[in-house]
Amino acid sequence: MTEPILIAKELRKTFGDNEAVKGISFSVLRGEIFSLLGPNGAGKTTTINMLSCLIEPTGGTAEIAGHAIPGDSLNVRRAIGVVPQEIALYDSLTARQNLEFWGRLYDMSGKPLAQRIDEVLAIVGLSDRAKDKVKTFSGGMKRRINIAAGLLHRPRLLFMDEPTVGIDPQSRRRILDMVRELRDGGMTVLYTTHYMEEAEQLSDRVGIIDQGRLIALGTQAELTRVVGEQETLRLHLSEEASAALLSANGDAPTADGQVALFNGLPGVISAAAVDHQIVVNVADAGEALPGVVGRANDAGLHVRSIDIEEPNLEAVFLHLTGRGLRD
C-alpha cells in the first residue's frame, strides 16, 4: 500500500473570533493528486498556508515527508513547492530573471540553477519566452511561470492553490494537462479548487471542505455513492429576468443558497441556486422533470435549457450541505 507523504491531524486555525479551519484531518498519498474541493471561504487557502508553514496552526499537527508541523519548518519548506493563488512574480523582470530570484531563495546558483531553469521552462512550455519580461505575459502564462518557480528545487510535494482562477479556458486546459503530467512523472500534488469539474478530471482522491470542516473524503466513485441513484436537473436561467422573478415570487435563494420553489414536488430531494442556474437533485430525472418544468413555468422563470446529469461531486456537495459549490 502507498504510504502518505502528508498527514494532517485535527488542524485548526483561528483569526480573532473567526475559526477558519475547524479540526480537519486527512492524508495525501505519495504519487497522487489529492484535491481539496470547496467554495470560496471554506478554509482551503488557510489549510495550505498552515501546511506550507506560512502561518502557525492554532491547534493540531501535521507531518510532511517525516517533518513535523509545527517544529521543523525549514525541512518542511525544502520538501514542498508552493504555487500560490496570487501571482508572485516581478513584472519588470524576465521569466528567467524571476526564476533566478526564486532559485536563490532555495540556495540554488550557478550552472545547476541555470540548467534547472531550462528544465522547468520546458515543463511549463515557455522556453521560447525566457528572455521576455513578465509584464508582456498573459494571465495564463504568468500562472505557468508561478508553477515553474514551485518546481525549481525538485519538491517531493507540490501545493497548488486555485491555480486556474481568472485565466482563459485554453490556459486552464494547459495547466490541468500539466498537473496530470507532473503526477505521471511521480510528483505528489495537493490541489485546491472550487471548480467541481477540475476535481473530477484531476483527482485520485478528493476532500470536500466547507465552513472550515472536512465533510467528506474519498475517490469520486466513493463520494458519489453518498447520493445513491440520484440524478441532477440543471436549469439554466436568463440572468436578470430570472433573478427578479425569483425575488418577486418570494422564492429567492435563502442565506445558505437553497431554493424553496420546488419543495414538495414528487421526486425532488433538494434544490439550490448556483450562479445563474438552479440545481435540483431528484430521485429519477424522467419522473421529476415534468413537475419541475411545470413549477418553473408557473413561476414565470426564464429557463433557457435543462441538463440531466448523473451523480457528480457538485451533487454530493449539494446533498451534504444544501448549497451549491459556488454560493
Label every PLM stretch briefly.
Residues 281-327:
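C-terminal coupling/interaction segments
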Residues 13, 26, 235-237, 280, ...:
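Preference for bulky hydrophobic residues occupying beta-strand positions
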Residues 3-8, 13-216:
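ABC transporter nucleotide-binding domains
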Residues 125, 267-271, 302-307:
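A short linear hydrophobic-aromatic micro-motif
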Residues 30, 128, 237-239, 284, ...:
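Non-catalytic surface loops within mature trypsin-like serine protease
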Residues 176-283:
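ABC transporter nucleotide-binding domain
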Residues 106, 227, 231, 266, ...:
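Conserved NTP-handling cores and scaffolds of large molecular machines
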Residues 77, 121, 224, 317-318:
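Conserved protein kinase catalytic domain
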